[in-house]
């Protein structure tokens, strides 16, 4: 009888963490709004660290403003910084949406962020006029960095955006809200591709595909401000209250669907990322259920191509190989199920998040695959390192942060998740959907071939 063995962290210290702080998730979410600008209410390092991480992973600049709190703010508060910061952004960039993202310092100080925003709106109206000021929406996003992680920050941001901007109307718009989670531009494009094949118009909450992978073209605007192409328009964010339903593709992003369901009686579904055959099938069925649209031959063809690719390589190269997976709780569960579909053994799955969905979903994977799985629950890469020294595997799947561990242990690493900074092009290649599954089949198999098949074996492969 297969079972899930949950291993919790015994020590207090965190060594080589898998997660980072809440504001990153909020900044990511706001960056997916067309003409949206995150304003970090904290020190300069709070924004610099995230911009640096985004630049390494996405190979794109990120426009993130900061109120630049210093030591005096710890005594006197950050009122002046936030009010002047909002005013400067409004005057110079004229954004459609400004997301005020709190941090450790502003939360510990106890700044009245809501009150400061009200004052800032009055000041902006005085300088720009009532009409211009009313066009700029300000969203307060509380993300205390000293608790939780970037996934909670993302969840808080999406809920704040929906609660602040959604405007109900008398009629449904026939659209479907999709919360993608913290994924890559290639993944979001794949989501839009699948919806398009089914004739479904989606509202992405939010769409970071173009903002983090934009074309390099001369600006059509003759003057500043210049914004990256794309993002979810403000009109769509306001219209999300009138959609047919909400699907969250990340089990940690459940607050916004619950809020929409409670306020507007809108059906919702929170699930794992649609990675692999079973999870993508589930996503397609949910879309069909909410919209009534049929599954097209094009989608079935894409599914068939993946299954054909799996049949080509699974039994020959992958069957029975043990895998260690670490990272995002939603992606790791999806990857665990997919490697099991390939005939591999998800020996250990590690996440830095204490998320009960993670444990419950992994129990299902263990039962389906009929394999025992060790779950490092709320752990770090040091715990995974210690585990793998005693329980060796054939393949590691996770972010670039595990590259040195993989090298020391002599285990090949297939890079998935955030951040990936020692390979190029990863952010453009989906791992979601059937096309994403095809990329994973090829990538995982080639990684195995690089390590375990020597030149003397090549003739046997011909």
Swiss-Prot record:
The keyword Cell membrane does not apply. This molybdenum-iron protein is part of the nitrogenase complex that catalyzes the key enzymatic reactions in nitrogen fixation. This is Nitrogenase molybdenum-iron protein beta chain. It catalyses: N2 + 8 reduced [2Fe-2S]-[ferredoxin] + 16 ATP + 16 H2O = H2 + 8 oxidized [2Fe-2S]-[ferredoxin] + 2 NH4(+) + 16 ADP + 16 phosphate + 6 H(+). InterPro entries: ChlB/BchB/BchZ, Nase/OxRdtase_comp1, Nase_comp1_CS. The keyword Glycoprotein does not apply. Tetramer of two alpha and two beta chains. Forms complex with the iron protein (nitrogenase component 2). Its EC number is 1.18.6.1. Binds 1 [8Fe-7S] cluster per heterodimer. Coiled coil: none annotated. GO terms for biological process: nitrogen fixation. The lineage of its organism: Archaea, Methanobacteriati, Methanobacteriota, Methanomada group, Methanococci. SUPFAM superfamilies: Helical backbone' metal receptor. Transmembrane segments: none annotated. CDD domains: Nitrogenase_MoFe_beta_like. GO terms for molecular function: ATP binding; iron-sulfur cluster binding; metal ion binding; nitrogenase activity. Its cofactor is [8Fe-7S] cluster. Keywords: ATP-binding, Iron, Iron-sulfur, Metal-binding, Nitrogen fixation, Nucleotide-binding, Oxidoreductase. Disulfide bonds: none annotated. [8Fe-7S] cluster binds at residues 21, 46, 104, 145.
